C-alpha cells in the first residue's frame, strides 16, 4: 500500500497545523474580549492649540490672498501670514491663518449672519485658544460726508445695530418725523460700547500713521460741499452702524444718526455690515473688553447735491469715488501699529488693557 503510506504523514501535519491555527485564533478572540492587548505604538499627543494674541477679521477678499487686486484681507495676509499653513475650521467660510507670534486672521464673509457664523465656528474650534485674545474687526465702509471722507480710517467707539427695531414707510408718517422706533427686549444686543481704554490706546498708537490717497479720490471729494468730505484722509473714531441693508441717501443717513443718538452712542461716522453681530458672538464667550472695530471709508453714504440717490448707487463708468486700493492699505497701516504693539508688549497686555 505505498500510496496510503505516503499520504498519512502529510495528512497528520496538515491536521496539526490546523489545530494550532484554531488554538491561536481562539486565544486572540479571548484576548480581545478580555484584557486588551498592549500596543507597542504610543498614541500621538494631541496638538497644542494656538495661543491667539490678536485675531484680525476681514469680511471679503476679491481674488487670491496675495498677488492680485487687494480686498480687505490681502495686505494683512502679506504682512503676517505669507508663510502660514491654513487651518481649516468646519463651519467657517475660509481658513484661519496664524503666525509664530500668535497673530491670527481670517475672512469671515459679508453680512451679519455670514460673519457671525464663521466667528462662532472659529471661537469654538479646539485648535485655537482665545482665552487672552484681542480682536480687530476690519474692513471697508461708508461714511456721511458731514463726518468723514474717502480714505479715512475709523476706530469704533460704539457699535449699533441699524436693523433691530420697528420701521415704516415715510409716506405712512408725519412728514419729516422719524420712521424708526426701538423694540423692547433688544437692549443688550442692539448696541455695544467698546472698551474706551482700548480705543484710547488704538488712537494713540495709530493717529499719525501715514495715509495713502489718490488723485481720483481727491477730485471726487470736491463734488461735496462739506468741509469734512473735502479734506485729506485721517484716523478718527466714532459710532459704527451695522446693517445688513446697504442703506443709502440723506434720509437713511439722517436716520442712522438719529438711532445713534437715541441709544446714547457717539456720532455715527461709519456704516458697515458685520461688527455688531461679530461682537455679540465674541461677547457670549469672552466679553467685549478686547474688541476693536477698524474701518476704512470707500464711499459716502449719500450722493452729492447734484445727483439722486439712485445715480450715486449706480454711477456711470468713471464716476465712482476712487480710492479703494488706497483705503484698504490705509486700514492695514493703521491696524498694524496696534497689532504689533500688543504682541511686542504681550507681558503687559495679556492680563488686560494696561493703563496709559
Predicted feature descriptions by range:
Residues 3-20:
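Bacterial N-terminal signal peptides that target proteins for export
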Residues 27-28:
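C-terminal motif of bacterial Sec signal peptides marking the signal peptidase cleavage site
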Residues 31-356:
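Accessory terminal and edge-of-domain segments that mediate assembly/interaction
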Amino acid at each position: 500500500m505505498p500510496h496510503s503510506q505516503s499520504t498519512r504523514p502529510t495528512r497528520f501535519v496538515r491536521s496539526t497545523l490546523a489545530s494550532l491555527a484554531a488554538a491561536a485564533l481562539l486565544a486572540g478572540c479571548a484576548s480581545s474580549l478580555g484584557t486588551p492587548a498592549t500596543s507597542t505604538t504610543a498614541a500621538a499627543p494631541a496638538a497644542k492649540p494656538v495661543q491667539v494674541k490678536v485675531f484680525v477679521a476681514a469680511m471679503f477678499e476679491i481674488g487670491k490672498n496675495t498677488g492680485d487686486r487687494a480686498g480687505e484681507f490681502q495686505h494683512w495676509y502679506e504682512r503676517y501670514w505669507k508663510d502660514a499653513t491654513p487651518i481649516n475650521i468646519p463651519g467657517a467660510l475660509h481658513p484661519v491663518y496664524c503666525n509664530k507670534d500668535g497673530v491670527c486672521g481670517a475672512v469671515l464673509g459679508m453680512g451679519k449672519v455670514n460673519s457671525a457664523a464663521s466667528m462662532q465656528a472659529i471661537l469654538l474650534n479646539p485648535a485655537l485658544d482665545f482665552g487672552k485674545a484681542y480682536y480687530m474687526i476690519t474692513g471697508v465702509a461708508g461714511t456721511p460726508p458731514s463726518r468723514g471722507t474717502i480714505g479715512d480710517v475709523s476706530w469704533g467707539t460704539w457699535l449699533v445695530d441699524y436693523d433691530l427695531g420697528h420701521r415704516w414707510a415715510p409716506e405712512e408718517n408725519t412728514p419729516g418725523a422719524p420712521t424708526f422706533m426701538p423694540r423692547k427686549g433688544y437692549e443688550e444686543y442692539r448696541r455695544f460700547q467698546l472698551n474706551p481704554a482700548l480705543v484710547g490706546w488704538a488712537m494713540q498708537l495709530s493717529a499719525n500713521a501715514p495715509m495713502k490717497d489718490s488723485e481720483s479720490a481727491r477730485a471726487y471729494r470736491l463734488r461735496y460741499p462739506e468741509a469734512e468730505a473735502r479734506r485729506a484722509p485721517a484716523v478718527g473714531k466714532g459710532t459704527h452702524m451695522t446693517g445688513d441693508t446697504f442703506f443709502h441717501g440723506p434720509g437713511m443717513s439722517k436716520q442712522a444718526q438719529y438711532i445713534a443718538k437715541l441709544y446714547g452712542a457717539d456720532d455715527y461716522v461709519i456704516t458697515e455690515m458685520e461688527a455688531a453681530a461679530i461682537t455679540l458672538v465674541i461677547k457670549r464667550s469672552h466679553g467685549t473688553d478686547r474688541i476693536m472695530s477698524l474701518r476704512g471709508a470707500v464711499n459716502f453714504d449719500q450722493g452729492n447735491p447734484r445727483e439722486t440717490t439712485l445715480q450715486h448707487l449706480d454711477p456711470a463708468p468713471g464716476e465712482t469715488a476712487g480710492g479703494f486700493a488706497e483705503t484698504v492699505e490705509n486700514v492695514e497701516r493703521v491696524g498694524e501699529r496696534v497689532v504689533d504693539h500688543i504682541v511686542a508688549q504681550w507681558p503687559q497686555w495679556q492680563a488686560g488693557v494696561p493703563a496709559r
